[in-house]
Design a protein with these regions (language model features):
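Polar, glycine-rich mid-to-C-terminal structural blocks
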Residues: 197, 225-282, 476
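Membrane-interface coil-to-helix junctions
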Residues: 23-118, 137-162, 264-323, 358-376, ...
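Active-site-proximal, structured, solvent-exposed surfaces of multi-pass membrane proteins
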Residues: 356, 546, 557, 668-775
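Extracytoplasmic/lumenal acceptor-recognition loop(s) of multi-pass membrane glycoenzymes
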Residues: 476-601, 628, 633-680, 719, ...
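Contiguous transmembrane helix-bundle modules in multi-pass membrane proteins
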Residues: 136, 151-160, 167-185, 197-198, ...
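Transmembrane-helix signature of polytopic, membrane-embedded enzymes
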Residues: 118-140
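Hydrophobic alpha-helical membrane-insertion signals
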Residues: 6-77, 101, 241, 246-258, ...
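Transmembrane helix irregularities
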Residues: 94, 141, 145, 172, ...
Length: 775
C-alpha cells in the first residue's frame, strides 16, 4: 500500500487546476470561440443524433427510435446516439436546440474531465503537481484524443479512465465499498461507449485488479479485502450498463457487422512507422492543408516504399502526445529500474500491451488476443487502442517528470547521449523513408520543427527542476506554458480537427441552406393524411446524410458504420452517402423501382445530375424541380404514401427476392406481399381508406376504414422491438413487402397503433435466441 496522505496534503491542488485550466482554454480557444468546428464525423455522425436527442426530449417524445435515417433506426442500441452519455444527456435535457458550437464545447469538456482525472490521480499517488499538470495537458490535448477528436464516442470511452483508475485504486487499497461503487460508476461510463476504446479501457481496469492481487506478498489477504469494493463496483456498473450493452449486442447481431474477420480487423493496424510521430508531429503531412500525406498507408508510400495492406485514415497514426512526453520517454526510459518502480510498473506494462494491441498484424500478440480475448473480434481497426496508449504514455511520462522534479531520478551523462542518439535515429529513419517516398523536401521542415520543440522541452524541464524545490506552482506554470505552446502549434486546428464554422450553416436549427429550404417547402406542399414523404440526399456534403436528425426530415440513408442487415441487403446502403450511394442491388436495381416507391422517396437531392448516378433512368422519370448551389433536386411522382390499406395479399419468397430481385407486377397500393398466410387473410376488391392520426418517434397511430377488412401497411423498416395493437388489442406485425410492416384489420373502422418497446422487445428477442441456440 502506498503512503500518500502527507504528500497529497502538500499538493497545491487549486494552483494545479488553475494552471491546467488556463493552458487548456488557451489551446482550445479556436473551437470554443467559434472560429472553427470539429469536422467530419463530429458534425456528421455525432452532432445530429445529439440534436435529435434534444429535440425529442423538448417535444415530449422518446429518443429511442428515429424515423429520420435508414427508414427507421433503433437509437437506444446505437452507441453513436449519445443517449447514455451523461454529459450530452444532461445538456439535451436543458437545451432543446443545442448548436454545433455548444457540441464542440461538450467535446472539450470531456477532454477537460480526462485531464482533471489525471491531476487527481497524481495527487492521490503523491506525485509532483507540475508533473500532474504536464501529464493532464498531454492526456487531454495530445495523442489520438487530439488528432481524432472527431470521434466523440471514443473520447468518452477514454476520458473517464483516469477517474476509474483513481477510484479503483482507493477501493482496493482501503477496501472501501464507496470507492468501489464510484469506480463502478466511472467504469460504466467507459463501457457505455461500446467501442474498441471502451473495450481496451475495460481490460486496463481488469488488469489493474489482477495486478493488485498478484503483485507482491499477501496475495490472499488482498484478494479477500478486495471483494467488498469489487462487488459494489460490479453491482453499480451492471445496473448502468446491462440494458444498453445487451441492446447493442442484439443490434450488432442483426446488423451488417455481426462480427469482424481477422483479415478485416488487421487492415486497421497501427503501422510501426507511425511511432515517428511521437517525436515529430507532422512528419508525414497528415495534418497540413498544403502538403501531401505520404505516410502509411498513403499512395506515395504504397507506390514507392511498399504495400501495407492497411485501410486507415491519414490521422489514425497521429499519436503526437507532446514533446515533453517524447523527451521524458527517450531520455529516461533506459534509466535502470525507473519504469519498473512499483508505483508505475502497472502503467508501464499496460502501455506496452496496448501498443502491441494497436500494432495489430505487425506482432503475433493481436492474433492471440483476437482468438482468445472476449470482445476483440467485434471490432475493426486495432489502431483505435492508440487512444488508450497515448493516455497511458501521458501518465508514464508524467511519472518520469515527477521523479525528475523531486530529485529521485538518477541523472547520468549517458542518458543524454542515448536521448540524442535516439532522436538522431528517428530523424535518420524519417529522412530515409522520405527519400524512398520522394517526399524529402516535404519532411525536412517538420523534422526541424520537431527537433526544435524537443530541444525547448529539455530547457523547460531543466527550468522546472530548478524551480520545483521552491515552488511547485512555478514549475507547473513553466511546463504548462510550454505544453500550451507545443499543442497550440503542433495540434492546431487542421483538416481533421478544425474547419471554418461557416462550412456548417446547414446544421443549425434556423438554417437558411437553400437545399434544405427547398426540400422543406416541397415536403410541406406534398403533405397528405396518409403521407410522410422521404428524401434522398447523395453527394451533397459530408455532413448531410444524418442532417434529417436535426431538421426532422426522413432521409432514406444516413451515416453510420452500422445498418440493419435487412436494410443493407435490400438497398446496398454504405456507411455514408456523402459522396456516392454505392452499387444498386437486385431488389433496388434503379431509382426507378418499386422499392424506391414503397420507401416513399418523393424528393431526391444529388450533388450531380441523376443520370450520372443511374444511367438507366429516363428524362421524364424524375422531373427536376430545383437547382441549388449544392444539389440537383428531383421529384419522384410515383412515391407511395407512408401508410397503405391493402385489401389483397400475395405470397412471395423474400429471401429469393433479396438475392435475385424480381418484384411481382402488382398494384402495391392495393396488394401486399407476405412470406406466409396470416391466420386471418382478407382478400377483397373493396377499397378502403387509411390516415395517420399520430406519428411520433416511437408511437404511431393509424386509422383505417376497410369495409371488407385488409392490411394496414406501414412503410417503415420491420424491427422485432415494435409492437402493434388494433383498437387496443395486441396484434401481430407481419413482415410485408420484404422489409416493411403490416397488420391485419377486420372489416370496419379501426385504430392501429405501433409502439416501439425496446425493453420487452429486446428481452423477447434475447429469449428466442437462447431457445434457438444449440444445447
Amino acid at each position: 500500500m502506498l503512503n500518500r496522505s502527507s504528500k497529497a496534503a502538500d499538493f497545491p491542488l487549486a494552483a494545479a487546476f488553475g494552471i491546467y485550466t488556463a493552458a487548456f482554454l488557451a489551446v482550445a480557444s479556436p473551437w470554443l470561440l467559434g472560429f472553427v468546428e470539429v469536422p467530419w464525423d463530429s458534425v456528421s455522425t455525432f452532432y445530429p443524433p445529439f440534436a435529435f436527442l434534444a429535440r425529442s426530449i423538448a417535444t415530449g417524445q422518446s429518443p429511442f427510435w428515429t424515423p429520420n435515417i435508414f427508414a427507421g433506426w433503433p437509437q437506444i442500441a446505437d452507441p453513436q446516439a449519445l443517449i447514455f452519455s451523461p454529459l450530452h444527456l444532461l445538456v439535451a435535457l436543458i437545451d432543446p436546440k443545442p448548436t454545433p458550437r455548444l457540441f464542440d464545447g461538450l467535446t472539450f469538456g470531456l477532454l477537460y474531465i480526462g485531464g482533471a482525472g489525471v491531476i487527481l490521480l497524481f495527487r492521490d499517488r503523491g506525485w509532483h503537481a507540475a508533473a500532474a499538470v504536464a501529464a493532464a495537458l498531454a492526456f487531454s490535448l495530445g495523442g489520438s484524443a487530439a488528432s481524432r477528436i472527431q470521434h466523440i464516442g471514443q473520447l468518452q470511452s477514454l476520458v473517464f479512465l483516469p477517474l476509474a483508475i483513481l477510484m479503483l485504486s482507493r477501493a482496493l487499497e482501503h477496501s472501501s465499498w464507496l470507492a468501489g461503487a464510484a469506480a463502478g460508476l466511472f467504469a460504466s461510463f467507459i463501457v457505455l461507449g461500446r467501442d474498441q476504446v471502451a473495450l481496451v479501457g475495460a481490460y486496463v481496469l481488469v488488469g489493474f485488479v489482477l495486478w493488485h492481487w498478484l503483485d507482491g506478498p499477501g496475495r490472499g489477504a488482498r484478494f479477500v479485502a478486495s471483494l467488498k469494493p469489487l462487488i459494489a463496483g460490479v453491482v453499480v456498473g451492471a445496473c448502468i450498463i446491462t440494458v444498453p450493452v445487451a441492446l447493442t449486442v442484439l443490434l450488432a447481431q442483426s446488423s451488417n457487422r455481426p462480427d469482424i474477420t481477422f483479415a478485416h480487423a488487421v487492415q486497421g493496424s497501427l503501422h510501426p512507422a507511425s511511432l515517428l510521430m511521437l517525436a515529430f508531429a507532422d512528419v508525414f503531412g497528415a495534418s497540413d492543408f498544403h502538403r501531401e500525406f505520404w505516410g502509411p498507408p498513403s499512395i506515395p508510400w504504397h507506390e514507392l516504399i511498399g504495400q501495407t495492406g492497411l485501410y486507415d485514415s491519414q490521422n489514425t497514426g497521429q499519436i503526437y502526445t507532446g514533446a515533453l512526453v517524447a523527451v521524458s520517454l527517450l531520455a529516461f526510459t533506459l534509466t535502470r529500474g525507473v519504469l519498473w518502480a512499483r508505483e508505475v510498473r502497472f502503467f508501464t506494462v499496460a502501455a506496452a500491451m496496448t501498443l502491441l494491441y494497436a500494432f495489430g498484424k505487425y506482432t503475433p500478440v493481436f492474433g492471440l488476443l483476437y482468438g482468445y480475448l472476449p470482445g476483440v473480434s467485434l471490432y475493426r481497426r486495432p489502431a483505435d487502442a492508440t487512444f488508450v496508449l497515448c493516455g497511458l504514455l501521458a501518465i508514464v511520462s508524467g511519472y518520469l517528470i515527477h521523479r525528475l522534479l523531486t530529485g529521485t531520478l538518477p541523472l547520468r551523462r549517458w542518458q543524454t547521449v542515448v536521448a540524442v542518439l535516439a532522436v538522431a535515429a528517428m530523424v535518420a529513419i524519417s529522412i530515409v523513408l522520405a527519400r524512398w517516398a520522394g517526399m524529402l523536401e516535404s519532411a525536412v521542415l517538420p523534422l526541424l520543427w520537431g527537433c526544435g520543440f524537443l530541444l525547448v522541452a529539455v530547457g523547460a524541464l531543466v527550468l522546472a527542476r530548478r524551480l520545483a524545490p521552491q515552488s511547485a506552482a512555478a514549475a507547473a506554470f513553466v511546463l504548462a506554458i510550454y505544453c500550451a505552446a507545443d499543442f497550440a502549434w503542433n495540434n492546431a486546428p487542421n483538416e481533421s480537427t478544425g474547419l471554418p464554422s461557416s462550412m456548417y450553416g446547414a446544421l443549425r436549427s434556423d438554417t437558411d441552406d437553400e437545399t434544405l429550404v427547398l426540400l422543406r417547402a416541397k415536403l410541406k406542399a406534398s403533405a397528405a393524411p396518409d403521407r410522410r414523404d422521404r428524401v434522398e440526399m447523395i453527394g451533397v456534403a459530408y455532413h448531410f446524410p444524418n442532417i434529417g436528425l436535426i431538421h426532422d426530415l426522413d432521409h432514406l440513408y444516413g451515416h453510420n458504420p452500422l445498418r440493419l442487415a435487412l436494410f443493407e441487403d435490400a438497398t446496398g446502403a454504405p456507411d455514408t452517402v456523402a459522396a456516392v450511394r454505392g452499387p444498386f442491388t437486385p431488389l433496388l436495381p434503379s431509382y426507378r423501382s418499386p422499392l424506391e416507391d414503397l420507401f416513399g422517396v418523393r424528393f431526391l437531392a444529388f450533388g450531380q445530375p441523376i443520370e450520372k448516378l443511374d444511367p438507366s433512368v429516363k428524362p421524364d422519370d424524375f422531373p427536376l424541380v430545383g437547382r441549388t448551389k449544392d444539389a440537383y433536386v428531383y421529384e419522384n411522382p410515383r412515391a407511395l404514401p407512408r401508410v397503405l390499406l391493402a385489401t389483397r395479399w400475395q405470397q412471395a419468397d423474400f429471401a429469393a427476392m433479396l438475392r435475385n430481385g424480381g418484384w411481382p407486377d402488382v398494384d402495391y397500393q392495393r396488394t401486399v406481399l407476405l412470406e406466409r398466410a396470416p391466420a386471418v387473410a382478407p382478400n377483397s376488391e373493396t377499397p378502403g381508406t387509411v390516415r395517420i392520426m399520430l406519428y411520433e418517434n416511437t408511437d404511431i397511430e393509424i386509422e383505417s376504414d376497410a369495409p371488407s377488412g385488409g392490411f394496414v401497411v406501414l412503410n417503415d423498416i420491420w424491427h422485432p422491438w415494435w409492437r402493434a395493437s388494433v383498437d387496443g388489442k395486441p396484434a401481430d406485425i407481419l413482415k410485408a413487402n420484404v422489409l416493411f410492416r403490416a397488420v391485419v384489420v377486420p372489416p370496419g373502422k379501426h385504430v392501429v397503433r405501433f409502439k416501439f418497446e425496446p425493453l420487452s422487445g429486446g428481452w423477447a428477442e434475447l429469449r428466442s435466441k437462447l431457445h434457438a441456440a444449440p444445447n
